[in-house]
Amino acid sequence: MTRDIMGKKALLAVVAVLTLFAGAATTSAAAATAEENYRFYCAQCHGLEGRGDGPNATENQPVSPRDHTSAKEMEKLTDEDIINSITDGGTATSKSSLMPPFGKTLSRSEISELKGLLRKLCKCKGK
């Protein structure tokens, strides 16, 4: 009987440790930085530096991806415009339908952090 109880306690301890590690992995994966999210979701079109020259930006597209480093263009946008574009895609702000919506992919916090990164890239505040 004692051996059976010790075996159950050992199994319970292993499950508890594995659960802790699984929770830590999930938390760190969900807490991607704005830079990581930009590289993963945005750089394909906007480029790693944000200049609109990513590998998916081709001359065949009806519009070019926005150059996020252009203060002249980016300062025309409010923070709300940027958040809406990221959340609902390009059509939400009467821009390219090629810009997909990320509102169901990224959290509000991640979208807000991306907006902050875009403001850093353009070195501007917006209107």
Residue ranges and their predicted role:
Residues 22-37:
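Electrostatic cytochrome c docking/interface patches
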